[in-house]
Each structure stands twice: as structure tokens, then as C-alpha cells.
Amino acid sequence: MATQTFTFLVTDIEGSTALAERLGNAWAGVLADYHRLIQGALATHGGQKVVSQGDGVFAVFASPRACVDAAIEAQRALLSHAWPAGEMVRVRMGIHYGEAAQTAAGLAGLEVHRAARIAAVASGGQVVVSDAAAGLLRDSLPAGVG
């Protein structure tokens, strides 16, 4: 099966189950706002959402720099958003660069799994970048990012 190279972005709300329990019926609105803010950053920087499930988003970009720019924009938007009941929605994000195969079910391959694992090690409000992606970014990171 033929593969393509992508820059992957995986996002996940930290502590989403506890947050959903605290917010009750307001949780649906939180999810809607979260997805809207993430989608806005994806659209601005040329990202393409592959799948979203619950509080997770998996997207791809043509370049690592566009992916980093989208992640930074999304984190800033999430941080400045007025969430209900004074809650803070903290999102962990992971960025990885690698190959994946397009299947009827979506993208598949070891690098897709690695991207998810990279996001899992992030803390809420943090973007973790794999060595594979970081190696392509060394000379093009935005000011203040390192």
C-alpha cells in the first residue's frame, strides 16, 4: 500500500471525564467551542481534520511549520476563551512527522500511533513535538518557541 508523508497533530482535553462530570449539561457546549476553536486554527494554517472523536482531534498538515503555527494559535485561543463556570479547558497536543497509508477507514500506520503517544505525554496547555518533526523545524520556529 502506498504511503504519503504528513505532519500529524493530535489533540486531547486533559481530564475530560472529570470536567464533563463537573459541567453536566454545559459539557456539550464546551465540546462545541473546543472543536470550533481547533477547526479555526486548522483552517487558518492549511490543516485537514482526519477524524474527531469526543474530545480528541487528529489532523494532518503539509508542513511541520504550519502544524506548529496551528497548535500555537489553537492553544492561545483555548487559553483566552471564556469557558463556563470559571473552568479552564486545558488541551494537550502532540506533533509528529512521518508516513501513513490512506485506507478506507482513514490514515493508518505506525507513525499515526506514534503521533497519538506523543500527544499523550503532553500536559494540558502544552505542545510536544517529536524528534522527527523537530529536526525539520530547527531553523524555522516562531520567536519564543524552542
Go through the PLM ranges and name each one.
Residues 39, 58-146:
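Catalytic beta-strand-to-alpha-helix segment of the class III nucleotidyl cyclase homology domain
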